[in-house]
Structure formats: C-alpha cells, structure tokens
C-alpha cells in the first residue's frame, strides 16, 4: 500500500485509464507500442523518448501527386488500422548531402498475409522524387541495408510502428525495439506518402515526450498510460524497470551512474570491466518522506514500505548504489553508518569546518565538505579525517568488501561489511525530488564512456555478447571471430603437471602469540612475547614444513575474542607461505636478524576500536627448491605428476608454464632433467624414473565462431569435443560444430572455399569455371579525346626515411642494473631489435647513395650568372632603336609622315623620281578622280607660286601659265576629300559592327577560363603533394611519439617506474613486476620496429618508382597515359628536391573534350576471314554506319585502308585460365604481396613494447595544414572564377571590325636654296681658316721660313745656344 502511495506523491499526474488519440477519425491506442519495451511487472515508471504524442495530430494526406514533408524532425511513426494499403517514407538531411546515408522504406499494397516492404539505407547521388519500387534495383550506392523485409500488419490491433534517430543511433519500433548505428547521418527531413488513411497515418516526431506507465501484467492488456507533466525528466533519467536477469534496460540513459575506479578515471573510450551492474532490485524513494533503515549484505534488499521496480532478484547484494539528487542527503551527520564483520561501526561525518567535525544538518553548499570517519565500538569513538568530498554528489556506492565510492572514485577502504545503516532525513528543499537504491552484484560488462559518463553498457553473459566484449564492440558485422576462454562454447585444455618425485620428511613450525587485556576502560593490552616451537629461533631442516599459529590472548568480559590482523614485509604472508612455496633455506626468529623480513601480528580492541601489536616474527630465507611450505604433511615418496600426451595441454613442467603438445621420443640424454632453447623456451624434459625423453611442441587451441545476424550459428575448432551443438563435421584442418547438418549452398559468410549459411550449415564452395563467350568479335563504347589543355601536375615521392636507432636496454630499463640483469634472460631480443633498425637504415642509405649523384657541371648550367654564353656583342652594328634613320638622313632631311590612299603615293614616287617639275605630270587617279599627294616641298611651292605670279603678270596673255597651279590645288583637295571619305566609311563600319567586335575578347576569355581551370587543377595537385610531404615528415615523429607514450603504461605492474617498484617491494616480488614491464616494453618496441621495417619496405618501393619516373618522365617522354602526372598525355617533367624525397612537376596535355564511339576489335568477314588493326594506338569504330579509324590519343577519323589491317586465324576469342601457382612461371618477376608479407613477418623477431620518461623525446612536426588549406581554398576560388568567366563568355556576342586602312606615307622634304647657300658659305669659311692655320704655324711653315731669313740678316752667323744632351739609363 505504501508503494502505491509513493507513486501517488511522485507521479501526481498519473491517470490509469486508456488514453486514445484522434487520428484521421480513428483512435490510436499506444499500449501495443509500449509493450515492446518488455517492462517487467509490477512497475510504475516514466518512459521517455522520441515517441508518438497522443495530443498531436496525424498526417492523413492520400493524394497521388502530393507528399507530406517534415523538417527538423527526429522520427516518424505510422499508425495502422486496416485495409493493408501501401505507403512510402524517405528520410534525408535538410540540405541533401550525397556523401552521407539516406533511408527509403516502401510497402506495396499487397494485403497482410504475406506482405513485404523494401528497406534501403544507401547514399544516393542526387535528390529523388519519392515514389514506389517493385524490385531490389536501386541507384543508391554503398548501401548499408537493401533488403526485402516482412511487413504484415494485423487489422484493428492498435499497431503503431516507427523509426527514430538521435545522432548516429537509429531505433526501429516494429515487433520489438531494434537499435543500430548509421554513421554521420544528420537526418532532419522526412517525406512520406500514404495511399489510405486507415493504413498509414503518419506523425513526425521532433522532441522527447514522457509517459507514465503502470504495468500490472505482461502484454498490452496490462499497461495503462498517460502523459507525464510533473517531475518527468528526473524520473525518466533515473528510474527504470529492471529486466529479467538483473539487466538494466538498454534505453536507460545512465544519468548519475559512474564507472567505479580505484585509480584514474576513464574520460572517453570503450572498456571491459567487472563491476556492480547486475541489479537485483531497484527502489525509488521520495525525499519528502526520508528513510531510516538497515540494508543487509547477507539478504535480498528489503526497504520497508517499498517494493522493487521491475524484476526482483532473490540473491544478496555485493554493492548498494545510491543514486541521489541531493548532496546533503549523504553528507549529513550520521546519514551513513557501515557495520563491519567484526562488529565495528564506521560512520561518515561531514562539516564545513576543517578542524572540528560537527554533527549538523545545516551544511552550506558553497563551502567545501570536510569529511571524517567516526569508528566506534561500544562507547569508544575514534575520529579521523577522511577527505574533502565533491561539492556535488550524484552517486554513493558501498560494497560488502568495505569500499566506499563517491561519484565513481574510491574514498574509503575499510573491513568487509555486513550491513549499511541509513538515516536520510527529509531536510531537502526539493520535496518533490527522489533518489534510488539499487542492490547490485558484480558482473562482466562492456562499457562505453564519454566525458566520464556512461553512454552504453553490454552484459557479457551470453555467448554472443562474450564475443562482442572480446572485440570491444557493441555491434559486430557478420564474420568469423576468435573465441575467448571465458566463452561457454570454448573448449578447455587438460592440465599437465610434472615435477621430481621426492621422499619427504615434514616438520611443523608453531608460532605462539600471547598477551592480555586488563579490565580498565578502554582496555589496555600487554604482550606476553612470541615463541617459535617454544623457543626464539627455528631453522627448518626437513624438506617440507607447515607454519601454524596459536593466539593465546586474554580478554576482558565485554570484548570479543579472536580478532587478529597481520602485516608483512615478506614476499609472502602467514597464509600463502603454506601454498607450496619453495626455499633454499628458511629460519624463523622472534628477534631481529640480518636480512630478515617481518610478519607482524595485531590483536583488535573491539571496545576502543584500536589495534595492538601482539608480536613480530622475523624470517630469513633464500631462493631454492629444497624446502617447500605445504598446507598439510606429504611424507614419504610422492610423485604427483600428471601427463596428457599427444594433445594440446596447458602444462607446468619443472616450473615452466605454457601450452604445448607432449610426445614421447626415442632420444636419450645422460645429463639434465629439462632442456631449453637458446631463448629459454622449453623443448623437452626427462622422466627421471624411466629416463624417457618427452618433447614439448608449442600449440594453441584455436576456436572461432561463425557470427551471423547477431548470433553464433557455428563454431570452428581444432578440438572434436563440444556439448553445445548437435552436429560435428570434420574438414581438412578443423572441426565444425553447429545445429544444421545440411550442406550450405547459399552462404552468408565466405572465407576461402568455406561457406556458412544463416542457419549454421556449412559447405565447401567449388570454383566456378568461366564459360568462354563465343562471338565473332567484341565491341564496346569508348571515349576518344577531341581537345586538350596544357596543365602542370605536382607529385611527391618519398626516397628515404630518417634513420632511427633505439638503445633497447636504456629504453626498457632506464639504466636500472637489476632490470638489465633480468633483460639478459631475454637472450637476443634487444640484439634483434637494434640490428633490424640499423641494418635497414644502412641498406637504405646505401641504396639512396647509389641512386643520387651530384654533377658540378649541371649545377653551373643551372645558374644563369655562370652560364658561358660566349663573347658575341652586336651593339656596335645595330641601331639604338629599331627602324631609326641613319646619321646622314638625320642631318640632311626633314621627314613628314602622312596617310595615303591605296597605292597612290608609291606610284607617284616612282613616276616623279624626286623631280618637282614632274609633279603635275605624275598625277594619279583614285576611283577615276585625279589626286596628288597632299605634302608639297619648297620647290613645289616656289614652282606653283611662280606659275601663279606669271599668270597674273600680263593678264589674259599669260593667264594660261596659272593652270598648273589650279590643277595641282584641285588634285590635292581631291586627295584630302577622298581621305575624309575613307575615314567616314571606317567610322560607319565601326558603328555597324560594334556588337560583333569582341571575338578576340571572347577567345581571350576562353583562354583565361581554361588557364584558370588548369591552374585550379594544378593547385589541387600541389596541395595533395604538400599533404604527402607533411605526412612523410610527421609520420616517423608520430611513431616515435607513440613509442614514447607507451612508457606511461605499467603493463599491469604496480607502477611504470622501475626504481619505484624496487623501492616499494622486496626483490622477488619486484622482479616479477619488472618482468611485466620488460615484456610489455619489448612488445611496444617490437611493434615500433615492425612498423619501421614496413615503412622501410614502402619507401624502398617508392624509391624504385621515383627512379622509373626520373628515367621515363624527366629524361624522356613517357608513352604511358597518366604515369607522369596522373592523367593526360605527357610532354615533359621537371624535378625538385623536397623533404626526404623528390617533387615532380609534370607538364601534360589533359583532355577536356571527348567523343563517344562504338569501338570494335576487328572485322569478321563471312565468318571465315578475321581482320584486326595492325598498328597499336589506333581504334576501329563505327559512326553513322561507317567504319572509321582514329588514333586513340586524339580524335582524327579517316577511312580505313588495307595497310591498316592484319589478318588473324579465326573470329573466335580464346580465353586461357591459369592458377595462382602458374603465374610466376609465366611472369617471372611477379610478386605475391600476401605471401611476401607472411614470409617477412615469419622472419621478424618476437617483438614487444617500451617505457621511458616523456621528456626524453623531442620531435619537431612539419605542419603544412594551413598552407594546404590555403591552396585548396585558392583552388576552389579559381574554379569559381572560371565558372563566372564561362557565364560572361556566353553573354558576349561575336564581333569583328574590318577597317579600310590608310597607307602610312613617309615624305622627305629637301631644304630651300638659301639653306644650301648658307651651308656652302660656311664650308668656304671653315676651309679658309684651316688652310691659313696650316701655312702660318710650324717650323716648315711659310712664316717660319721668312722669320729665319730676316733674323739671319740682322744677327749674323752666330749659332744659337743649346744645352748638351746627357745619356740617361732608365731601369
């Protein structure tokens, strides 16, 4: 009754009557839809989701030419009443995206008995008008689903089906609820058509709706519902109905449920964990009412007044999960008290005061919560600081093992618990709030986490789910998957144990610990000392011993007895020492000894909740197998070995553990008991009693499951024993277990020649022989280029890697000496790793050096400043400006340039020959009109002036002398008039043909358009090449970074620091932990080496390709289409150095126009004569009924000739089938890539992973992302520009202006006579002065001679004075 009252308070708006919705004059009942959620009765829950809204209208459009459309929606539901009519639904993005998936669903009008529908989830290249379909053909590509599915509806059965989506998750509501994932769908638009309202009324869903459900019995008849209007969000997010088996329903959003952790918290990812997610009982409680009760771990959950929501488990709980919406609910004074198995109570007390915990319920939310533990036994209390709790608490988890988690993180570890006492008062301000208690057990689950919150959860408790968990995937595609040992279908291997037979003597080591509690309060403890076999020191002399304890403690009357604890600094404790641990020597002492570890014994004070040291046992021990600790005496001769021969077994042989097949051999060895390889692997062992040698061959029991349509239909195993399937069939190399014994003919799974059907049947598939097509000749449609554009394509090819060397020992051990000793046991592991990298680097360096050479002469030729161009210099023989006059012309003549009519001026010059007198006689006629050139020099001007003056001198007598002047003037005026006429006609032609004057501009625009288009394509190739360069430069850095990151992994050791491990543990335990690190780091290192070797192989192949491209593209012209530049006919190529490779610039002719023709391989004449083209590179095709021949590279059709053909034997085309093994015989250099990789991997060393400080690695990354994005943006902009130019070209009319040109006439005008007279006078004066100077100066001049004569007469014959000349030597 209280349970009903609870939900009357929380679900204040629940009305438990059937709620029908008006739908096209019909009512819609949603109980059948809600029954698909399998909510276990009795339950009262709030169901939230993208569901039909009972208050919204349904779309009932049935017109043939109309479609209903919804935008911004997240789902569509269909209501069916009767008549079995058809419908069509299409779902896509609002802005159609052909690169993503769309959904199409169509149901024909085909009744209800065997009705079906077509469901497709594909990528359609363009928008489609929503219409029906009648077959499986579709224009969609890359379909995830293209099926013909059952679609039978039942009349008048309240059937509502639908599809909803949220991000990538798509949900189908049909016979049950199905979930699957369509990546990046971004659906938001629905288009639908319905042929009849009774069959397919539609409702589009765009928001979450909440319904109150009251489930009393299974099925639709036991469900009542109504729309929830109050506190709905919280109820739907936190309360669920537990499914059968304790599973949380998949629709639960896991709000306020966290992944428990004792260390770090997972932020994002998928992980497999063992945590308390199996729910025995879920109880929802209102905060208004509060709760005070005790929850026991030894019995099923029982909350007085409340019952479980959904399925109710009968087992006891391992953990209680408290899902709270109020932080104060669990941090208040005495809200949570833990009852331990030894009777101690531990309560959690929180306060806003860090120094003094107070029992107060008035905590301030804006201040930190300082929490303490109050440990009490009787009236004694011990308060210790616990931690600072988070300001917001959403989940509180308490396990029976004494762990307390807050929001998923562990805050308290205490002793195992028997119960939890709650005292949750109704102090919250949110009186309408609620919280839940879930009694849970630990189970194996797969969890997806995002932002530390649980997104999805999968229970690994079924064979199918176990496979999914092993693959860390919530959905698996059909295929074959490995089966783990925890799968119920897995076959376990027998265990082999071999040890030496021993004759044992046994002894007991008795440890006595004593002490007394007095009667004071709290009681005080006094230790009486510790004895070993009633003494102080015992060394074991037998080869077996058992350690026993006797606690002799005196207790007061109010204390419990026999509560002891212990701690150990030894690699064992008081219990595990008897579990067949072996020693070389071991001694026990009650006083400290050199090299001894300690076992300390404590007695617990149940009144004061304080532990007291009762005694200490010191243990000295050495490694060996002489002495064994046993739980009981095993005296006498004992051989407990157990052998399983000739089968794959898990063995423990003389301490070696592994999996192998043990076989008896005929070999004998005198020495040794077991025999190993150089690497330490067990090869054989000896039976010391009989001397027989047994070999050990490693084995692995391989088992795979055939997974079809989310279920296991069969198991492939190497073992012939299984109890889960009805049939076992034997095949070469394996056994197949299934429930279907028929032979599979239409397989769903195919691997090699094995096929598995949906039912689990298996069959061997025979290869199908290809039937040769017998026909006269083959023909088909091909495209031949008709036009080309020149383009530059950029290509990058890597030539070498950066060499990497790894110090294996330093990487694995980080300089730790003890770790290096352990590493030496791995024999050649480090040697193989280091040598593999070094040999690969040296081999690559040698190949690169032999490939690349440097030519000094070529470098000089490439530099313009150093190019030896010779000593040619033509500046002295060429004019300064083209077309200039000579110097004499510049001095003697003035040049006048005018326009002339046709050939008038040239004819006039030839006639007059430069004589002015012949001016009028050489007059020319143009179009019947006499004309003279318009320019007259001075001679002509004076001549016609004299003629005019002469005609005027004597009046009428001499008037005829003026006629030449008149004729000349009229002729020259005619010349000017005709020039004007030509100019006018040119102006008229310009005006008439302006609209077609842009033809050259159009051609220019077309050229610019093509250039921009090719530039855009070129920029794309540059961006791709730069992207490859960036990947090459950064690829190795990423690998090294990943290798360094592995150093953070502890590989299941307690720490990733070797020094830290040895500082915290004893040597034996630390060696085991460090061995895990060594194994893991070697695995990481081997993975890096394998990746590096693979990269070396890839670069070697690219280096070979680069050499081919240099020879074929750079040094010659490639005949191969697309080999140099991806597409087009190759012209020439250039190469440029790039980081770790070469950048090729290929100039190619790219086809930009094609013509489609029907090509034929040859001609068959009367079925007797077969003819085909003789020359390669040509194609024979049919066009308009005519046979033509054209080069394949360029469409140049012509009629075929006899010389073009060669006759072949027959018209029949023959096919030759060969096997893969025969291919190398036909093609010797053929390489089977898969086989080569298998051989490489088989020869690689057994490799592993590393651990180093992250600051050791420093790698600079080349980031060209911005440049590449910029190039791509520019390319896109150029492409858009070319489209704009194309539009402009279409808008320009073709125009052509053909002007009538006037000749350009050059006339040289002679200077007048007085100019020449002045020139002559000037020359006479200059010559006179020069002559005078010559005869008047010098010793031989006239003046000089006369002066000498006159001087001799006056002075007589006395010679003139002169100075003597001295000889001067010049050195």
UniProtKB/Swiss-Prot annotation:
Q: How does it sit in the membrane?
A: Single-pass type I membrane protein
**Region of interest called S1, as start-end residue ranges on this chain:** 24-737
Give the residue ranges for region: Heptad repeat 1 (HR1): 963-1082
Cellular compartments per GO CC: host cell endoplasmic reticulum-Golgi intermediate compartment membrane; membrane; viral envelope; virion membrane
Which Pfam families does this UniProt record tie to the protein? Answer: CoV_S1 (PF01600), CoV_S1_C (PF19209), CoV_S2 (PF01601), CoV_S2_C (PF19214)
Q: Where in the cell is it found?
A: Virion membrane; Host endoplasmic reticulum-Golgi intermediate compartment membrane
**Note from the entry:** Bat coronavirus 512/2005 is highly similar to porcine epidemic diarrhea virus (PEDV).
Q: What protein name does the entry list?
A: Spike glycoprotein
């Amino acid at each position: 009754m209280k349970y009903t009252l609870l939900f009357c308070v929380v679900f204040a708006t629940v009305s438990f009557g059937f709620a029908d919705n008006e739908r096209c004059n019909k009512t819609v009942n949603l109980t059948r839809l809600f029954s698909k959620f399998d909510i276990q009765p009795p339950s009262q829950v709030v169901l939230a989701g993208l569901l039909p809204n009972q208050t919204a209208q349904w779309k009932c459009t049935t017109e043939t030419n109309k479609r209903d459309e919804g935008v911004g929606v997240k789902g569509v539901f269909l209501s069916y009443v009767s008549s079995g009519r058809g419908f069509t639904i299409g779902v896509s993005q609002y802005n159609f995206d052909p690169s993503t998936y769309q959904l199409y669903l169509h149901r024909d009008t085909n009744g209800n008995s065997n009705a079906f529908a077509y469901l497709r989830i594909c990528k359609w290249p363009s928008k489609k008008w929503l219409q029906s379909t009648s077959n499986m053909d579709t224009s969609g590509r890359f379909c995830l689903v293209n099926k013909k599915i059952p679609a039978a509806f039942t009349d008048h059965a309240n059937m509502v089906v639908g599809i909803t989506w949220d991000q990538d998750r798509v949900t189908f509501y049909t016979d049950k609820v199905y979930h699957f994932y369509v990546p990046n769908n971004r659906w938001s638009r629905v288009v639908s058509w319905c042929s009849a309202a009774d069959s397919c009324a539609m409702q589009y869903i765009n928001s979450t709706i909440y319904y109150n459900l009251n489930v009393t019995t299974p099925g639709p008849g036991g469900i009542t519902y109504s729309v929830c209007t109050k506190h709905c969000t919280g109820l739907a997010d936190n309360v669920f109905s537990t499914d059968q088996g304790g599973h949380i329903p998949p629709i639960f959003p896991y709000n306020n449920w966290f992944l428990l952790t004792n260390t770090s918290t997972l932020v994002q990812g998928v992980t497999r964990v063992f945590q308390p997610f199996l729910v025995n009982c879920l109880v929802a409680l209102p905060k208004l009412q509060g709760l005070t009760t005790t929850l026991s771990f030894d019995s099923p959950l029982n909350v007085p007044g409340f019952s479980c929501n959904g399925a109710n488990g009968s087992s006891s709980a391992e953990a209680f999960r408290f899902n709270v919406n109020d932080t104060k609910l669990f941090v208040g004074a005495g809200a949570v008290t833990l009852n331990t198995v030894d009777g101690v109570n531990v309560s959690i007390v929180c306060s806003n005061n860090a120094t003094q915990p107070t029992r107060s319920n008035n905590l301030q939310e804006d201040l930190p919560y300082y929490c303490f533990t109050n440990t009490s036994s009787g009236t004694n209390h011990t308060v210790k600081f616990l931690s600072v709790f988070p300001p917001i608490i959403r989940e509180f988890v308490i396990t029976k093992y004494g762990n307390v988690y807050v929001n998923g993180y562990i805050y308290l570890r205490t002793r195992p618990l028997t119960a939890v006492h709650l005292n949750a008062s109704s102090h919250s301000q949110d009186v309408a709030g609620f919280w839940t208690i879930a009694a849970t057990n630990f189970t194996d689950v797969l969890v997806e986490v995002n932002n530390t919150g649980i997104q999805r959860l999968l229970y690994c408790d079924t064979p199918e789910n176990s496979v999914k968990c092993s693959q860390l995937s919530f959905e698996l595609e059909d295929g074959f998957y490995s089966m783990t040992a925890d799968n119920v279908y897995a076959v376990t291997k027998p265990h082999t144990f071999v040890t030496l037979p021993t004759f044992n003597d046994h002894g007991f080591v008795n440890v006595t610990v004593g002490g007394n509690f007095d009667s004071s309060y709290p009681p005080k403890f006094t230790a009486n000392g510790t004895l070993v076999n009633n003494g102080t020191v015992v060394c074991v002399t037998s080869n077996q011993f058992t350690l026993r304890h006797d606690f002799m403690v005196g207790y007061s009357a109010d204390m419990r007895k026999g509560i002891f604890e212990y701690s150990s600094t030894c690699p064992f404790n008081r219990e595990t020492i008897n579990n067949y641990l072996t020693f070389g020597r071991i001694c026990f002492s009650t006083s400290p000894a050199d090299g001894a570890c300690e076992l300390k014994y404590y007695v617990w004070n149940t009144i004061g909740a304080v532990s007291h040291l009762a005694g200490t046992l010191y243990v000295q021990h050495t490694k060996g197998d002489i002495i064994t600790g046993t739980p009981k005496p095993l005296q006498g001769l004992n051989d407990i070995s157990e052998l399983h021969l000739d089968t794959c077994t898990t063995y423990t042989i003389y301490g070696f553990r592994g999996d192998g097949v043990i076989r008896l051999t005929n070999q004998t060895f005198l020495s040794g008991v077991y025999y190993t390889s150089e690497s330490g692997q067990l090869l054989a062992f000896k039976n010391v009693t009989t001397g027989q040698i047994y070999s050990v061959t490693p084995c692995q029991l391989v088992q795979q499951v055939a997974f079809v349509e989310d279920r296991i239909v069969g198991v492939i195993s190497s073992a012939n024993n299984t109890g889960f399937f009805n049939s076992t069939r034997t095949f070469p190399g394996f056994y197949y277990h299934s429930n279907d014994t028929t032979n599979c003919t239409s397989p769903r799974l195919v691997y090699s020649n094995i096929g598995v059907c949906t039912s689990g049947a298996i069959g061997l598939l025979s290869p199908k022989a290809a039937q040769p097509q017998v026909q006269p000749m083959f023909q088909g449609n091909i495209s031949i280029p008709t036009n080309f554009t020149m383009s530059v394509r950029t290509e990058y090819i890597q030539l070498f890697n950066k060499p990497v060397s790894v110090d294996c020992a330093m990487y694995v051990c980080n300089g730790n000496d003890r770790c290096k000793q352990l590493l030496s046991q791995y024999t050649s592991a480090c040697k193989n790793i280091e040598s593999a990298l070094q040999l690969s680097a040296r081999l690559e360096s040698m190949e690169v050096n032999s490939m690349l050479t440097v030519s000094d002469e070529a470098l000089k030729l490439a530099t313009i400043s150093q190019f030896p161009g010779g000593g040619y210099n033509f500046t002295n023989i060429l004019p300064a400006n083209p077309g200039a006059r000579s110097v004499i012309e510049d001095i003697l003549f003035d040049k006048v340039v005018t326009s002339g009519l046709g050939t008038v001026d040239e004819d006039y010059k030839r006639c007059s020959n430069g004589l002015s007198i012949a001016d009028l006689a050489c007059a020319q006629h143009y179009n019947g009109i006499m004309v003279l050139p318009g320019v007259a020099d001075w001679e002509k001007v004076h001549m016609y002036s004299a003629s005019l003056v002469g005609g005027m001198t004597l009046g009428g007598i001499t008037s005829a002398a003026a006629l030449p002047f008149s004729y000349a003037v009229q002729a020259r005026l005619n010349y000017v008039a005709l020039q004007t006429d030509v100019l006018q006609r040119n102006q008229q032609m310009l005006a008439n043909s302006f609209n077609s004057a842009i033809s050259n501009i159009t051609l220019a625009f077309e050229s610019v358009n093509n250039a921009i288009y090719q530039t855009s394509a070129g920029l794309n190739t540059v961006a791709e090449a730069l992207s490859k360069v960036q990947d090459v430069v950064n690829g190795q850095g990423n690998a090294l970074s990943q290798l360094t990151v592995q150093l953070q992994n502890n590989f299941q050791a307690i720490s990733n620091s070797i020094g830290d491990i040895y500082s915290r543990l004893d040597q034996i335990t630390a060696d085991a932990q460090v061995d895990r690190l060594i194994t893991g780091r070697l695995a990481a290192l081997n993975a890096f080496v394998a990746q590096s070797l693979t990269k070396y192989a890839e670069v070697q192949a690219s280096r070979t390709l680069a050499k081919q491209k240099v020879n074929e593209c750079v040094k010659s012209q490639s005949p191969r289409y697309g080999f140099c530049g991806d597409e087009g006919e190759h012209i020439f190529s250039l190469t440029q150095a790039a980081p770790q490779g070469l950048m090729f610039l290929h100039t190619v002719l790219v086809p930009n126009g094609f013509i489609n023709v029907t090509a034929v391989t040859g001609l068959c004449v009367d079925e007797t004569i077969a003819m085909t083209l003789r020359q390669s590179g040509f194609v024979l095709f049919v066009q308009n009924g005519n046979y033509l021949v054209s080069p394949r590279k360029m469409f140049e059709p012509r009629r075929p000739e006899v010389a073009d053909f060669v006759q072949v034997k027959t018209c029949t085309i023959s096919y030759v089938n060969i096997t893969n093994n025969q291919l190398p015989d036909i093609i010797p250099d053929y390489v089977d890539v898969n086989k080569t990789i298998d051989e490489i991997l088989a020869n690689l060393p057994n490799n592993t992973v590393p651990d180093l400080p992250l600051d050791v690695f420093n790698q600079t990354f080349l980031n060209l992302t911005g440049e590449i994005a910029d190039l791509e943006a520019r390319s896109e902009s150029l492409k858009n520009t070319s489209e704009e130019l194309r539009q402009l070209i279409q808008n320009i009319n073709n125009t052509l202006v053909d002007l009538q040109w006037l000749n350009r006439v050059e006339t040289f005008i002679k200077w007048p006579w007085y100019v020449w007279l002045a020139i002559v006078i000037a020359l006479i004066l200059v010559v006179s002065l020069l002559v005078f100077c010559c005869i008047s100066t010098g010793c031989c001049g006239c003046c000089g001679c006369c002066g000498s004569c006159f001087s001799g007469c006056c002075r007589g014959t006395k010679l003139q004075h002169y100075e003597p000349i001295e000889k001067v030597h010049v050195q």
